[in-house]
Amino acid sequence: MQARALLLAALAALALAREPPAAPCPARCDVSRCPSPRCPGGYVPDLCNCCLVCAASEGEPCGGPLDSPCGESLECVRGLCRCRWSHAVCGTDGHTYANVCALQAASRRALQLSGTPVRQLQKGACPLGLHQLSSPRYKFNFIADVVEKIAPAVVHIELFLRHPLFGRNVPLSSGSGFIMSEAGLIITNAHVVSSNSAAPGRQQLKVQLQNGDSYEATIKDIDKKSDIATIKIHPKKKLPVLLLGHSADLRPGEFVVAIGSPFALQNTVTTGIVSTAQREGRELGLRDSDMDYIQTDAIINYGNSGGPLVNLDGEVIGINTLKVTAGISFAIPSDRITRFLTEFQDKQIKDWKKRFIGIRMRTITPSLVDELKASNPDFPEVSSGIYVQEVAPNSPSQRGGIQDGDIIVKVNGRPLVDSSELQEAVLTESPLLLEVRRGNDDLLFSIAPEVVM
């Protein structure tokens, strides 16, 4: 028995002696000699920590002396590589995967084939129809993405004449516009909101939003030579807005989208390309024009005037204005709109300096409410309005009864969303009937703005 044990030990020693020794790691790692394998399970460093070798995929053996380590998000369980997570996931390619590891394996394959990885969109199975996201219809529908982004800020505008005898609204013109501020400032063409009609009666502007809400509007500023106007509505809540881009950056051949409401068909969309961003007005027969227009083949119809012309980032680069013939339309560049708005703002600032009610104010925001409640637990529950930070001594507000800490919630019956609305009312209206929240009380004050000479 002892002899047999000695014999087995000798045979084992002989087998070990015949096994080739493990290759020593090089003193210096030469990555140029590393293989370039394609590994569905990902990569791990080799024993010398020099080259990357294939990791074991899900379901492959692991833990043995010659087995590769498990790949990303895998762990060795009872000799096999298993995923650390068992829940299904939805990928950005619209497919449902059994677990995160299956998605990562698919992402590695996609990277090798197309260079586009697959990301996790959500836990659980993909919603019905999401698998279509990888189809050409969804992949290349960039125009639909632009329209979805900008449509809520495009409005329909109608100009009526209120007949003095019959009380009926006689339509004079209609067109489009787009919202520039959350408080309801809208940009459109001057010819959409003005009329040379000699018929008696009072002209009225009506604005309809995409959600169907309608408001009366007033003209804030108008430049008939440039054919640009701003009008103002008083919404009950903050509105979606569009941002102005730089028309100077436009290139011929660039895709553009025109949107408006021709014939009262709201949010009618046409697309085209920019032919030129510098078509002189004199070339179009506009002798008094000093403006360069954007020429495009996007169709602009009657009623589309005043709507935005946007680039693929959803930025407004022009106002739809003229249609010469089929395939040739023109827009006022956004850089000219910016200049018009700057001049309007400068004029407002000058007028603001001439009329005042004597308060320092801040627009109510959730962060401001939290800040004020921290110092005053009895601060009222409000979601919008104007916080009176300070009342100037001997000012119209102080004489009228306004106090520090008051919250002005309405002016002349209109809810206040932004401080600019109160500033506009100070410039254009007198007296001002202010509805004020003071503690738990709702108070009314009549304030007459003073003019500074």
Swiss-Prot record:
Tissue expression profile of the protein: Widely expressed, with highest levels in both adult and fetal heart, ovary, uterus placenta, and bladder. In the endometrium, expressed in epithelial glands and the stroma. Also present in leukocytes. Isoform 1 is predominant in heart and skeletal muscle, whereas isoform 2 is predominant in placenta and kidney.
Compartments (UniProt record):
Secreted
Where in the numbering of this chain does the IGFBP N-terminal domain appear?
Answer: 21-84
Annotated signal sequence is 1-17
Tell me the Gene Ontology biological-process terms attached to this UniProt entry. Answer: negative regulation of BMP signaling pathway; negative regulation of transforming growth factor beta receptor signaling pathway; proteolysis
Which domain of life does the UniProt lineage start with?
Eukaryota
Query: Pfam families from the entry?
Result: IGFBP, Kazal_2, PDZ_2, Trypsin_2
- Where are the annotated segments for Serine protease? 175-340
- Give Gene Ontology CC terms: extracellular region
All copies of domain PDZ, residue ranges: 359-444
Instruction: Please give the chief subcellular localization of this protein.
Output: secreted
Provide the induction entry.
Down-regulated in ovarian and endometrial cancers (EC). Decrease of 3.2-fold in endometrial cancer.
Q: What is its EC number?
A: 3.4.21.-
UniProt entry keywords in alphabetical sequence: Disulfide bond, Hydrolase, Protease, Secreted, Serine protease, Signal
Report whether Secreted shows up as a keyword of the record. Answer: yes
- Classification via PROSITE patterns: IGFBP_N_2, KAZAL_2, PDZ
Which family does the entry's similarity section mention?
Belongs to the peptidase S1C family.
Q: How does it assemble?
A: Homotrimer. Interacts with TGFB1; the interaction inhibits TGFB-mediated signaling. Interacts with BMP4; the interaction inhibits BMP4-mediated signaling. Interacts with TGFB2 and GDF5. Interacts with MYH9.
Q: Tell me, what does this protein do in biology? A: Serine protease that cleaves beta-casein/CSN2 as well as several extracellular matrix (ECM) proteoglycans such as decorin/DCN, biglycan/BGN and fibronectin/FN1. Inhibits signaling mediated by TGF-beta family proteins possibly indirectly by degradation of these ECM proteoglycans. May act as a tumor suppressor. Negatively regulates, in vitro, trophoblast invasion during placental development and may be involved in the development of the placenta in vivo. May also have a role in ovarian development, granulosa cell differentiation and luteinization.
The identity of this protein, by name, is Serine protease HTRA3
Q: Provide the species name.
A: Homo sapiens
> Which gene is the coding source of this polypeptide chain?
HTRA3
